Structure formats: structure tokens, C-alpha cells
Amino acid sequence: MQLNASEISNLIKDRIKGFDGAAESGSEGTVVSIADGIALIHGVSDVMYGEMVQFDEATFGMALNLERDSVGVVVLGEYEHISEGDKVTCTGRILEVPVGPELNGRVVDGLGRPIDGKGSIDAKVTSPIERIAPGVIERQSVDQPMMTGIKSIDSMIPVGRGQRELIIGDRQTGKTAIAIDAIISQKNTGVKCIYVAMGQKASTVNNVARKLEEYGAMDNTVIVAANASDPAALQYLAAYAGCAMGEYYRDRGEDALIIYDDLTKQAQAYRQISLLLRRPPGREAFPGDVFYLHSRLLERAARVNAEYVEKFTNGEVKGKTGSLTALPIIETQAGDVSAFVPTNVISITDGQIFLETGLFSQGIRPAVNAGLSVSRVGGSAQTKAIKKLGGGIRLDLAQYRELAAFAQFASDLDPATKAQLERGKRVTELMKQKQYSPLTIAEMAVSLYAANEGYLDDVEVEKVLDFEAALHAYLNSNNADLAAKINAKGDWNDEIISEVKAMIDAFKANGVY
């Protein structure tokens, strides 16, 4: 029997008309391949981008690549027990982490699970790790100070509540030290703190937790730790989990501070995941969306207005603004701030604190380069006292740097230049500060006033810090009322100035330093 072409065509058409195979849409699939923490799954056509999928009772993954025939899933945890052919189920949920005051004083992993051996956390609220940042209308300008207790930062590079201030520098320049001091400085202010450690050694994170406990700051702090030994997925997600914990306070009219230590390692973890998912690499092998990786994270740090808080809390909290202040940390290679990730984060943030290896080696710690560091919005948030006194300090340091370079080639200098150089040496010495010893507003104001008014000019450079320590002790013991007055409002009026002047004159007359 022979069929001609038209009969074959009619047969095919009849078959097509009678076909009743509805396309299967499944919420259950099969593992096609598993390697390096990335599972390729077939059959889960219903899955959303970023959805949690379940391998077994204890193992979850996150869908990051949605392709025509398969889904690329990053496994959140150990993956050695997963094998080809295993069943995978969609959960229909986006990744959420526990948030709220129950986490204070605890160390958790990148998914909010406790890792400090202090038992489970019974958080009443969970929050998705990815949220859209508040819009322009919902924000309020930054006009309240976030005091770090570090003279060089609060006087020259001030940080406000709701600001994003980058801490950038080479390894071993004191970046984490500044962040930890900022947390310690908040212990009596009611500001809640979140310290996110990504790609750090477990011993380093343990040391941070110990220091915060020692200085009484752990009670209002939660540490989110995705250590170097943890999967890249947890190192990538930890920052978003920490941000969700901070947003809990921001949206309820409270103030929170979050430290990302550090975003360089987070970007490297994301690069690793992207390359394993076979996404096309770009500059320095980073994927094309690495800018968005950090911008969507840092834009969530903001000061929100009272209307936003009232709407979010359904009218429970009225007339209060909330803020989330971010201090992201970036590690540079040999001082190269023009690399891909540093330039991205510099452009996203509201200023940067630039730390220099050279200054650190000279013993100037914190090693802040006042010339390259800037705060774009913090000036309007400074306390009155520090704002009035800080300008003179910055000017003295700038003139000192200029003259010091010139003085290397000049044989004899006029008296005015010599006096400026001597003043600059003492101000540089005064800007040094020991770790774990943040200052109060009053202590800082008195130190800056002493420098501006020339009280340090007859003090030997080596004794400047001894002079300052003795002056603070004298202020807190003999003039506690004056210190309390300055700390309460941060005012700097004629009455306070005359009291401070009389106090320093009396102190210098004693000469006990």
C-alpha cells in the first residue's frame, strides 16, 4: 500500500486535532545533576525566581536560574547526600528569616539559625530577605547623628542615622575595629545593631562576639555569621538576612545600625555562584548584575518618615521616624580604589572613610585619611558642639599635610609656618584613639576645643594623649554636671564655652598629666 503526500498530510492533521495531551505543570521535579553546591532540576515548571525548593526534611535550595528545560538551584547547606534522581518539591515560599528582639545577644548563621549553643530562638515574626527599598516619598532627610565615639570620624566625616557610609581600605588597616567601636558606642543609645560577617574566620567572629560581651554591647546586637567554611550561597545571602533583621526596627519607628563585613567577600561568593550557574562573566569575571547585588542591599538602609511607620504598623506607632544606618566594609588590593567592586560601592554610598596602610604603619590609628574621606550627608546630622569644633580640626590637618610636604625641601621656615606645623603635629597625635574606647560627646568636644584654642601648643607631642586622658578624667570627676549638660543636647553656646574654658584653665594650672 502506497500513500501519497496529501494523504500523509491529512493523517498528521487528524492526529493533531485529536491530541489531548494537556501540558503538565509540576511542583515536583527530579535532580538531573549536582556539583559544587549547584543542582540542576527538571520538571518544576511552576517554580518562581528566588523560591525555596526542598530536597529532604533538612535541606533546602534557592532557584536562581530559570531555563526552558531545567532550573538551576543553589543548595543552602551540605549537598553531598543529594544524588541524581532525587525528588525535589517546590515550597511556594520566598526565603524568610526570623527577625525581632528575640535575636538580640545571639549569633546566627546566614539563614537566622542559632550557632552559639544557647538554644533555639522563638522569634514571633519572620521577614523575606529580599524587599523593595522605601520609595522617595517615604524617606526623610538624614538629620540625626549616629555617633561612633571616634574623634576623627565624628568631627570630620560624620555619620547620620539612615546614612550609608563606606569603610574602605587594605587588609589589616583597622576597618573592623572602627565598626566594632561604632557598635560599642551605641550600647546606651537604644540603637539596635546587626553585625554581618561574611567569609571571615570562625575565630575572628568569636573574638568579635567576646569583645562585644566584654564591653556590654552584645545585649542590643545580633551577629549574622557566614564563615569562610560555609557554602558560598550562605555568604551571599547573609547580608540580606541581616538587612531584614535591621528593617524590623526601622519600620517600627526605631533606629538600627548594620555592619557588612565585608562586601568584597560577598561579591566573590556571588561570582562563584554565578560562574557555577554558567552565567556569562564580565569585568574581573563578575556577573553583569554585581552592581545591582549591592545597590538593592544598600538602598534598604534609609531614614523613613512618620507616615511610613504609621502605615506599616497600622497606626500602632505614631509620630516616630525609623532609620537603618549601614556601614559597609570593602577590602582593597594595594590601595586600588578603582577596582570594579570598590568603585561600585563608592558610587552607591553616601561617602567613604578611607583607611591607609601607611598611616596605620606610622601608628596613626584609626588610620583615617582625612583628605580622601568624605561624608556627603552627615554634616547636617552633626551635633552642634562637634560641628562647630570639627571644622577647625579639618583645616589644621589639611594645612599641616600641605606644609609638611613643603617643609621637607625648605631649609628655614618663618615662625608662623613653624607654629602651624607644630599645631598640626599635635592635632594628628590627638586624632589617635585606642580601640574599644569610644568617647562621649562631652569628652570629644573638650578635646577638640583644647586643640582649636591652642591648649596643646605647649604640651610635648608624645604627651598629648596622656594630657587628653587626664583632661577627660578631670571633666568626669570634677565637672560631671558640665559633661551631662553637653551630652544631653550637644549644645555649644557661650555659657558652655566659658565653663569649658574655666575647666581647662583649672586643669592646666594643676599640671597633673
From Swiss-Prot:
CDD domains registered for this protein in UniProt: ATP-synt_F1_alpha_C, ATP-synt_F1_alpha_N, F1-ATPase_alpha_CD
Intracellular or extracellular location(s): Cell inner membrane
UniProt enzyme class: translocase
Database matches in Pfam families: ATP-synt_ab, ATP-synt_ab_C, ATP-synt_ab_N
InterPro entries in UniProt: ATP_synth_asu-like_sf (IPR023366), ATP_synth_asu_C (IPR000793), ATP_synth_asu_C_sf (IPR038376), ATP_synth_F1_a_nt-bd_dom (IPR033732), ATP_synth_F1_asu (IPR005294), ATPase_a/bsu_AS (IPR020003), ATPase_F1/V1/A1_a/bsu_N (IPR004100), ATPase_F1/V1/A1_a/bsu_N_sf (IPR036121)
GO cellular component: plasma membrane; proton-transporting ATP synthase complex
Entry EC no(s): 7.1.2.2
Catalysed reactions, as listed in the record: ATP + H2O + 4 H(+)(in) = ADP + phosphate + 5 H(+)(out)
Site (Required for activity): S373
Annotated residues for binding of ATP: G169, D170, R171, Q172, T173, G174, K175, T176
Record keywords: ATP synthesis, ATP-binding, Cell inner membrane, Cell membrane, CF(1), Hydrogen ion transport, Ion transport, Membrane, Nucleotide-binding, Translocase, Transport
Membrane topology: Peripheral membrane protein
GO molecular function: ADP binding; ATP binding; proton-transporting ATP synthase activity, rotational mechanism
Family according to the record: Belongs to the ATPase alpha/beta chains family.
Record NCBIfam families: atpA (TIGR00962), PRK13343.1 (NF009884)
Role of this protein: Produces ATP from ADP in the presence of a proton gradient across the membrane. The alpha chain is a regulatory subunit.
Quaternary structure note: F-type ATPases have 2 components, CF(1) - the catalytic core - and CF(0) - the membrane proton channel. CF(1) has five subunits: alpha(3), beta(3), gamma(1), delta(1), epsilon(1). CF(0) has three main subunits: a(1), b(2) and c(9-12). The alpha and beta chains form an alternating ring which encloses part of the gamma chain. CF(1) is attached to CF(0) by a central stalk formed by the gamma and epsilon chains, while a peripheral stalk is formed by the delta and b chains.
Protein name: ATP synthase subunit alpha
Organism name: Hydrogenovibrio crunogenus (strain DSM 25203 / XCL-2) (Thiomicrospira crunogena)
Lineage, opening ranks: Bacteria, Pseudomonadati, Pseudomonadota, Gammaproteobacteria, Thiotrichales
